[in-house]
Each structure stands twice: as structure tokens, then as C-alpha cells.
Design a protein with these regions (language model features):
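Acidic/negatively charged segments and metal-coordination signatures
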Residues: 1-157, 161-242
């Protein structure tokens, strides 16, 4: 029987398989690594396309308007290469709801996101894989994730604190920086059994900060009883403001 990720490594080292031979056995050409690279390439290509679409359909000041809403102030300068764009960029493209009146052209018939409007108008431009990825980004809201375990250079075992779901997130750079019990505000999407960050806040939260998230969870449960994906999309402003 093949060893599970959390089982003792068959080599007899005494440590978990995922932190021993599992990492060594994963080559750059294995299916998971190939899929991870493909998803990241699609993410970068779609972000550029959606940004062009937004500039054309919403005007050049949509970046400033998005920044004002995201940070709650107009004093934060926009720099597309800044760490803050790790959170602002994906939220702006996939999660920010745009009023119908703001669209100059190619807008949806009702309030929607930049990505959902693009899918309505230009889905035929995308190959099937890119379309599924974009649909996953539109469907999934940002949430707070707590790091439970880390495999440096590979990924992180994480719990969605608000929905109570556990996922193994393939993330090479963040897995080298985050520690167990830290938390991140992130946009984790799932495609073909792989989970990865499509966006995250630039600053990790420490364990003491979890108290505020627990208070947010209690508030959400009081309003909705069950915290679902739809609830998190609807309460985006409250979650983001925590």
C-alpha cells in the first residue's frame, strides 16, 4: 500500500512521508508539478487580459476607484508591482462587484465582477482549461486561512477558518515563508484536484489576530447561521474589513 502524505516515511527516517521522500520524489515533470505550472501561467495570462478589458470597459480611473474601496482611503498609491497587489489585483478582477452604471461598454446587465462580465462577453476567446480556471476564480471568495503544517517548497496544510474546510494548497514561495498557526487572507481556488492561491494579503497574521476572525465568524453565523461560499461573497466588505 502506498504511504499517505501524513504517514511515517517508508524509508524509515521517522518523519512524515510528505516531509521526506514525497518531496524528493516529485520531479518537475510529474503531473502535479506540470498542472501547477500550467495554472500559474494561465493565471498570469488571464490577469493581463482582464486588466486590458477593465481599462477599456471601465475607464482608466477604475484602478483608483478599486484601490479606494479596497483600502478604504484614496491616499494609497497604485503600483502594479507592489506587494499590496497580491491581494488588491485578484480581488479587483474576480471579487469586486461593479455597479451597472460604472460600465462604459461591454458591461453586464446586472451588477457583477470584471471576470464575470468578461465571461459573459468573451468566453469564446478562452480555451476550455482557461475558462474553467476563470470560472473557479469567480465562484470562490476570499477567506481567512490558518496554516496547520508546512512542506517548504511544496505547499501548506490550511484550514479555512470561516467555513471550517481543510485543504492542501500547492504554494512554493509562501510555503517557504509562512509558519504553522499564522493566518492569511487569501483567494484559494480549486481545479482538477489541485488547490492554489490566486491571491493573498501581503502581510501574514499572527495567532493572536485569530480572535478578530473568530468574532467575525460569530457575527456571520448570527446573520446567516451557516457560513457558505455564497455568504462570503455577499459579505465580502465585512470579511475584508476585519
Amino acid at each position: 500500500m502506498a504511504a499517505g502524505r501524513n504517514d511515517p516515511c517508508p524509508c524509515g527516517s521517522g518523519i512524515k512521508y510528505k516531509k521526506c521522500c514525497f518531496a524528493k520524489e516529485r520531479s518537475p515533470s510529474d503531473p502535479a508539478s506540470l498542472l501547477w505550472r500550467r495554472l500559474n501561467a494561465v493565471d498570469e495570462e488571464l490577469a493581463r487580459e482582464l486588466l486590458r478589458f477593465a481599462l477599456k470597459s471601465l475607464g482608466k480611473d477604475f484602478l483608483d476607484r478599486s484601490s479606494d474601496e479596497f483600502f478604504g482611503t484614496s491616499s494609497v498609491p497604485i503600483d502594479v508591482s507592489s506587494p499590496e497587489m497580491q491581494g488588491l489585483g485578484p480581488w479587483m478582477l474576480y471579487c469586486r462587484t461593479i455597479p451597472v452604471k460604472d460600465w462604459l461598454r461591454d458591461g453586464p446587465a446586472k451588477r457583477g465582477t470584471i471576470a464575470s462580465a468578461y465571461l459573459q462577453r468573451h468566453a469564446s476567446r478562452l480555451d476550455a482549461f482557461s475558462r474553467r480556471y476563470l470560472e473557479a476564480c469567480v465562484e470562490e471568495p476570499f477567506s481567512f486561512y490558518e496554516v496547520e503544517d508546512v512542506t517548504p517548497g511544496q505547499g501548506l496544510e490550511m484550514e479555512d477558518v470561516l467555513r471550517g474546510e481543510r485543504r492542501y494548497v500547492s504554494e512554493r514561495s509562501a510555503s517557504g515563508m509562512l509558519r504553522p498557526r499564522q493566518l492569511v487572507w487569501g483567494h484559494v481556488i480549486s481545479l482538477e484536484s489541485l488547490h492554489l492561491f490566486a491571491g493573498m494579503g501581503s502581510i501574514p497574521l499572527e495567532p493572536i489576530d485569530k480572535l478578530e476572525i473568530v468574532h467575525l465568524l460569530a457575527w456571520l453565523r448570527k446573520r446567516h447561521r451557516l457560513v457558505t461560499t455564497a455568504v462570503l461573497r455577499r459579505e465580502d466588505a465585512s470579511v475584508r474589513g476585519t
